Amino acid sequence: MSVNITQFNNYVAAGEFSVGVNTNENNNLLETITFVEEEHLTRLLGARLYNALQTDLAINNDGTATAQKWIDFINGVSYVDPSASDYTINYQGVFRMLKGFVFWQYISEHQYKRTSTGVRKLNAENSSMVDTQMTNALIRRKYNKSVDLYLCAQHFIDDYKTYEATASNIVESPATTYTVTISDTKYLANGDTVTIEGNEYTVANLVDDTSFEFTATTGLTFTDLTVSYEPFPDFKPVKPKYISFA
């Protein structure tokens, strides 16, 4: 999932996050990207959920997400606000957030200033206090914008803390195997735990937005067909802090 280094050292591609590094500085920037991704995503998700994300990313050789919930978390998605069905949330994902944090971390550590072609290193003899103040204000704005996006990412996960959908029927066939016919399985996966009438079951043989199976004692009947589950279990976020301009 890693943010690409060309998003920083190529001005056209990088835009607001260009740092104008040369080839010799690429290793430093790569180290910063790796550190920032792990640091901020662990704080955003909590350690166990971050590990779950890394496990999903490791499935594909190119490091892209496999599960739809992680695809949406990373890339962004528009969805209906669970608390206001007439309101659509346009969640932007985490790439811009991470780029802002990388920008702040790298520039802060290497004392750069922004020019028309990116951010260049300050020369102590030629730079003025105005240069330094402008540079500091710039990187603070980038950092605080990333904090905004960080909170949006946490809000997205919190909106899916518990997800509920209603099955059309639950049928036992053969004995001890139950098939749940359900048209909404958003962010559900094989191996997940669902709750039906207060009891927990493990999802198997999932067919997206169609059905899934679980195994349980024979002879069960269900009157309440509400299926609930947690798409992002073990979500334990750390709230970020804004940088003051005072």
What are these model-derived regions, one by one?
Residues M1-F95, E109-T166, T177-T181, T221-D224, ...:
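Conserved short "hinge" loops at termini or chain/domain junctions
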Residues A165-N190, T195-P231:
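Small/polar beta-strand repeat architecture
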